[in-house]
Design a protein with these regions (language model features):
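Hydrophobic/aromatic residues within transmembrane alpha-helices
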Residues: 9, 53, 79-81, 85, ...
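Specific transmembrane alpha-helical segments of multi-pass solute transporters/efflux pumps
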Residues: 22-66, 74-76, 100-102, 186-204
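Juxtamembrane helix-entry segments on the extracytoplasmic side of multipass membrane proteins
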Residues: 2-5, 10-11, 27-33, 105-125, ...
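Cytoplasmic-side transmembrane-helix entry/capping segments in multi-pass membrane proteins
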Residues: 32-40, 85-97, 115-116, 139-149, ...
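Helix-helix packing/entry segments at the starts of transmembrane helices
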Residues: 11-12, 47, 62-68, 132-154, ...
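Transmembrane alpha-helical core positions of polytopic small-molecule transporters
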Residues: 38-47, 51, 69-70, 104, ...
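Transmembrane alpha-helical segments that form core, pore/gating elements
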Residues: 4-7, 17-21, 73-74, 110-168, ...
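Hydrophobic transmembrane alpha-helices of multi-pass small-molecule transport proteins
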Residues: 15, 21, 76, 85-105, ...
């Protein structure tokens, strides 16, 4: 989205989500420090790294690197939370990741190693934040999201004012379509999507939910076909089937002789 800079759009998105949700939850006073750190690491720093990394890299490579969030999160759950990843789940995630590779196409890294580092760093700090969220067992997904959004909004706005420019002009000149996208991001992706995600993190093992992150390319393809009239290709079909097969295999309780 070209109208708004990266941190500005995220501050508006989380600000709207926070203002909507804060009325439905009580302040978690005993967890405020942890939530502040989660907001700083998992929102402000992560989005700053990821969006700046996306600027200097092609779409295929970006699509593959962003999907590292799932494997990194599963690995951290195994190391930090002592969860059992298991051979089947690891192979399933690997198979799904190969499907992402087929959909995205051959990555091109020449001269873009700095962008690669930023994207991998963004995925890593995001995974750290999700591990922290998984430890907030006494809070609901809506409570976590509401107060992460409230904490992250001023952080990202301050960061935007420091390293970006043209904020006021972007806001005042935005079209109805631009604001429609903002509200979609705030309500559908943030209020609905993150509420469900945070609830799962606080109630299910990280290694069990992380494979579902790899379904994102499939939802992106469906959205592009509906909204942008994109055509379904053979690589999309093969890659999509591999992703769904890989994710499904992580849910089956295989018993090996």
């Amino acid at each position: 989205m070209e109208q708004f800079s990266a941190l500005l759009i995220m501050s508006i998105r989380f600000g709207i989500a926070g203002l909507v949700l804060v009325w439905f939850t009580k302040p978690p006073w005993g967890y405020m420090r942890e939530i502040f750190v989660v907001a700083l690491i998992g929102s402000t720093i992560q989005y700053g790294l990821t969006y700046n990394g996306l600027k200097g890299i092609d779409a295929s490579t970006a699509a593959i690197l962003v999907q590292l969030e799932g494997p990194i999160l599963a690995l951290m759950g195994t190391i930090l939370l002592k969860e059992k990843l298991g051979l089947t789940r690891a192979l399933g995630m690997g198979f799904a990741f190969l499907g992402v590779f087929i959909i995205a196409g051959e990555p091109r890294l020449d001269g873009h190693i700095d962008s690669v580092i930023l994207l991998v760093a963004g995925s890593t700090v995001w995974a750290v934040a999700q591990i922290m969220i998984s430890r907030l067992k006494g809070l609901s997904g809506i409570t976590i999201l509401a107060w992460v959004a409230i904490m992250a909004t001023p952080q990202m706005l301050i960061a935007s004012l420091i390293i970006e420019d043209g904020q006021w002009q972007a806001i005042t000149s935005a079209s109805l379509v631009d604001w429609s996208i903002i509200f979609y991001l705030a309500f559908i992706m943030t209020v609905v999507g993150y509420s469900v995600w945070y609830h799962l993190l606080s109630s299910v093992d990280v290694s069990k939910v992380s494979p579902f992150l790899m379904l994102l390319p499939i939802t992106s393809i469906i959205a592009e076909m509906i909204l942008l009239d994109e055509k379904l290709t053979l690589s999309m079909i093969i890659g999509g089937l591999m992703i769904m097969t890989g994710v499904a295999s992580t849910l089956i309780n295989w018993r090996w002789p």
